[in-house]
């Protein structure tokens, strides 16, 4: 903000999924939802098979909805720096694409530096728009939402409208059973809590021996509910599913083309074909205060019929 002392924020940073991913939740000191900027979520992880760093984020503020966990970058580590890139949708024009770059540098146990930059000439020049210095204040460990909510969430006043509330029924502690088509039952649990002042829900789920992070958020810009999923399985990247509605009756269609695979291409362009390209879908058939049932189906290709893949049954513990 070009003031003498800069803008100060609190960042909660911790690992999840057995150390596979690093989560950052940013909390502005000014909590007035009408004015506060800088509240956000990011998840970063290394694809051990390719050496790529992948980052997905959701930074809602009063002027921009944050695109519901679908804001992504990818890159690599170079000379002690981690640099990730992606197509910059807000800054691009039909005549000239803009590419943004995030750089994590000067990384030690006690501090690191981040800067954000953009190029409109294919990398010949870069304009840095922000530099942030991070200093460790205390260690933070998280395995599930603490106290029923994620760090930095207070009164839920930033996204308080009805459209953002359709998935609130999943918040809480649940026992789960995943029922396979042959009748086999795999036990598990799910802990979900609000985050980002009402602009998202995050959950840690375990089904059998596999652990997952799930995020749900409504995007006013896309007019879609977005579900993000990342498992603890090595080499497996995050995925998205989208639905026009949330809650009972919602159908979340897989959107494989929405997961970033290029540092320069517009990955949002694939959302328009999600309904025809989807290889899996999740249908919320029961969404009650003490029970949720989700029917899973899959298909081989866009022309094939849907087949049953299982049913997830959640019963509330708290």
Regions of interest found by a model, annotated:
Residues 1-318:
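Hydrophobic small-molecule pocket/channel-lining residues, especially in calycin-type beta-barrels
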């Amino acid at each position: 903000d070009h003031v003498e002392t800069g803008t100060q924020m609190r960042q909660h940073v911790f690992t999840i999924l057995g150390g596979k991913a690093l989560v950052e939740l940013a909390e502005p000191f000014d909590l007035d939802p009408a004015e506060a900027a800088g509240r956000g979520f990011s998840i970063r992880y290394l694809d051990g098979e390719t050496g790529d760093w992948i980052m997905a984020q959701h930074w809602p503020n009063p002027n921009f909805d944050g695109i519901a966990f679908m804001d992504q970058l990818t890159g690599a580590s170079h000379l002690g720096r981690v640099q990730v890139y992606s197509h910059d949708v807000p800054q691009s024009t039909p005549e000239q694409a803009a590419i943004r770059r995030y750089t994590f540098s000067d990384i030690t146990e006690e501090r690191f530096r981040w800067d954000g930059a953009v190029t409109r000439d294919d990398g010949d020049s870069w304009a840095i728009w922000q530099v942030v210095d991070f200093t460790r204040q205390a260690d933070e460990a998280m395995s599930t939402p603490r106290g029923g909510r994620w760090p930095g969430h207070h009164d839920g006043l930033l996204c308080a409208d009805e459209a953002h509330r359709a998935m609130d029924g999943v918040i809480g502690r649940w026992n789960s059973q995943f029922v396979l088509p042959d009748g086999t039952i795999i036990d598990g649990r799910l802990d979900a809590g609000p985050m980002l002042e009402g602009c998202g829900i995050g959950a840690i789920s375990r089904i059998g021996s596999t652990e997952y992070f799930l995020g749900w958020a409504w995007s006013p810009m896309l007019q879609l509910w977005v579900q993000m999923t990342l498992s603890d399985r090595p080499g497996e990247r995050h995925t998205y599913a989208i639905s026009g509605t949330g809650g009972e009756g919602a159908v979340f269609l897989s959107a494989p083309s929405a997961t970033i695979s290029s540092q320069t291409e517009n990955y949002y362009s694939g959302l328009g074909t999600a309904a025809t390209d989807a290889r899996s879908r999740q249908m919320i058939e029961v969404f009650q205060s003490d029970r949720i049932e989700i029917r899973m189906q899959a298909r081989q290709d866009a022309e094939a019929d849907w087949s049953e893949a299982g049913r997830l049954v959640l019963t509330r513990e708290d």
